Amino acid sequence: MAVRKVRCPQCGKDALWAPENPWRPFCSERCKQIDLGCWASDSYRIPVPDDSNEPGTDPDPTSRA
């Protein structure tokens, strides 16, 4: 099986996609830890669809009286 090279999502360097690379898809432990830190500090977020039309939701929380 041929070893694939992929771009490290953190720094953009080539990284091996193989069992020999324990940090895949990252090129190094450092890049893996930087990425984990970004998730932990909320630098990365997964977009959530706007559910304002869903029953039971208050579209404007300041309108409560």
From Swiss-Prot:
Record carries keyword 4Fe-4S: no
InterPro entries in the cross-refs: DNA_gyrase_inhibitor_YacG, Znf_NHR/GATA
SUPFAM superfamilies: Glucocorticoid receptor-like (DNA-binding domain) (SSF57716)
Biological process according to GO: regulation of DNA-templated transcription
Role of this protein: Inhibits all the catalytic activities of DNA gyrase by preventing its interaction with DNA. Acts by binding directly to the C-terminal domain of GyrB, which probably disrupts DNA binding by the gyrase.
Family indicated by similarity: Belongs to the DNA gyrase inhibitor YacG family.
Protein name listed in UniProt: DNA gyrase inhibitor YacG
Organism: Dechloromonas aromatica (strain RCB)
Gene name per UniProt: yacG
